[in-house]
């Protein structure tokens, strides 16, 4: 298997927070959704991978090359979209296109104008006159017009209306139809990740709790409601976390097929990415 991104032993220490020995791999042609609550370290990790902040690591490889010493070549193949525009608000889309044509050797002006037209963006209007949604459309138009092999999104769909978010997800699906294209996407809108992710990586308090395939989460994880008797009878290893109220237990389990064999009448709901995150962060662990 070829990997677009390989991180080993990445560390970043602040006074009251730090990334703790992060290691992860992202196969080529796949979408990895990075989840975690605000302040968990998602943006710090992405900034460290991009070289925007200093950090320590054993190895950081992108497209099979060590990032250190190959930054210029690698950055040609990466596009990054944050949750706000990175362009001067006095620039117009036409002017931005001219600038980027001199930055990227594989800039495709025809594709750029195709996206501007598709997003119905006024080409001669300054960005300061754009709404947030229009500015983010501008970011996507620019990012996708130099044919990046790795697209990194840091909360890029936050604050957008559902219609445009759905359009962006369609565009990202089109993008990954090319097996050379890979996406690393951080988002607190977990329903978006449910729709397009091949892998999910969960970071909490600067620590990577797991990286799993989306199919594995769908097949194995579930949420069940039960009383004390059933809760006590569950295999402790099958319980990821639980929440208790006056009505009983709501339990996040990681082996729903095995549990169904033992408790055939027990109803187990499909766990969403949001369920996994909420229970692991706010739920209780079994002793």
Label every model-predicted segment.
Residues 5, 19-21, 75:
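Conserved structural motif at the start of ABC-family nucleotide-binding domains
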Residues 32-37:
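The feature captures the beta-strand-to-loop junction immediately N-terminal to the Walker
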Residues 50:
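Helix-to-loop junction immediately C-terminal to a conserved catalytic motif
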Residues 58-69, 73-74:
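Conserved ABC transporter NBD signature motif
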Residues 76, 80-139:
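ABC-family P-loop ATPase nucleotide-binding domains
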Residues 151-155:
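Catalytic Walker B motif of ABC-type/P-loop ATPase nucleotide-binding domains
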Residues 169-253:
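ABC transporter nucleotide-binding domain
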């Amino acid at each position: 298997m070829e990997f677009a991104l390989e991180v080993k032993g990445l560390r970043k220490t602040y006074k009251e927070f730090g990334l703790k020995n992060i290691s992860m791999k992202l196969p080529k042609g796949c979408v990895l959704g990075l989840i975690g609550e605000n302040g968990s370290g998602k943006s710090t990790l992405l900034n460290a991978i991009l070289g925007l902040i200093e950090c320590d690591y054993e190895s950081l490889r992108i497209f099979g090359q060590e990032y250190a010493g190959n930054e210029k070549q690698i950055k040609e193949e990466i596009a990054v979209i944050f949750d706000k525009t990175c362009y001067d608000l006095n620039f117009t889309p036409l002017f931005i296109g001219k600038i980027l044509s001199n930055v990227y050797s594989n800039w495709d002006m025809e594709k750029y104008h195709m996206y501007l037209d598709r997003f119905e963006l006024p080409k001669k209007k300054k960005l300061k006159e754009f709404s947030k949604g229009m500015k983010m459309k501008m970011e996507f138009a620019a990012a996708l017009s130099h044919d990046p092999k790795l697209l990194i999104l840091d909360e890029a769909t936050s604050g957008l209306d559902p219609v445009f978010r759905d359009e962006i997800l369609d565009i990202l699906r089109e993008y990954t139809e090319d097996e050379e294209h890979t996406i690393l996407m951080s988002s607190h809108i977990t329903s978006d990740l449910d729709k397009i992710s091949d892998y999910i990586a969960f970071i909490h308090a600067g620590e990577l709790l797991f990286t799993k395939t989306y199919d594995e989460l769908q097949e194995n994880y579930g949420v069940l409601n039960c009383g004390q008797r059933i809760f006590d009878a569950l295999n402790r290893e099958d319980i990821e976390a639980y929440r208790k109220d006056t009505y009983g237990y709501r339990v996040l389990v990681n082996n729903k097929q095995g549990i169904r064999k033992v408790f055939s009448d027990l109803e187990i709901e499909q766990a969403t990415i949001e369920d996994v995150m909420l229970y692991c962060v706010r739920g209780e662990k079994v002793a």
